Amino acid sequence: RQAVVERVAVRDLGLKGAMVDPNALGRPLGDPAFDPFWRAAADLGAPVILHPYLLEAVERFGVHYLHNLVGYPFETTLGAASLVLGGTLDRVPALTVVLVHGGGFFPYHVGRFDRGHQTRPEARRDGAQPPSTYLRRFYYDTLLQRSEALAYLAGIVGHDRVLLGSDHPFWLGDPEPLQRRTVTIAPR
């Protein structure tokens, strides 16, 4: 049903893509039950942005603004990891996914994901490549607040996979995204 709604939104209303919460009511995004949605997005050429909104175990994130500082990048990481480890990116190769907050923790802990793939059967599907081989299947926004972190991201995924992001109007948004982008990833 959601795939039909997406087709109407893109074809009839002119929308260019979709934004989904990585927390799909407690189900992993890589669950094959969501494949009709992912296939519809790919068929329409509509990118899907993973942007967290709902947190699991919210009581653990309730102090010190942790829901935003840790919780949202954590949810982005869960969404990306589920799409990779659950096989969605293999089943729907034309799918375009944008990860906000610089991809959460996924690009920075991809070595840990690779090690899990190598050593733990539950983190590996038959025929699946190591998670690091999927890094360039995603696009990433620049919302990292540190030039060094953005330089690392661009170095590991490629400059062509990094998109300007501001997170406007939220409080943790980057007030000068163009300046940070120019300093960090402009061609030399």
Regions found by a protein language model. Give the residues of each.
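Active-site gating/metal-coordination segments in enzymes
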Residues: 1-86
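H/E-rich (His + Asp/Glu) clusters that bind or coordinate divalent metals
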Residues: 65-85, 92, 96, 100-188
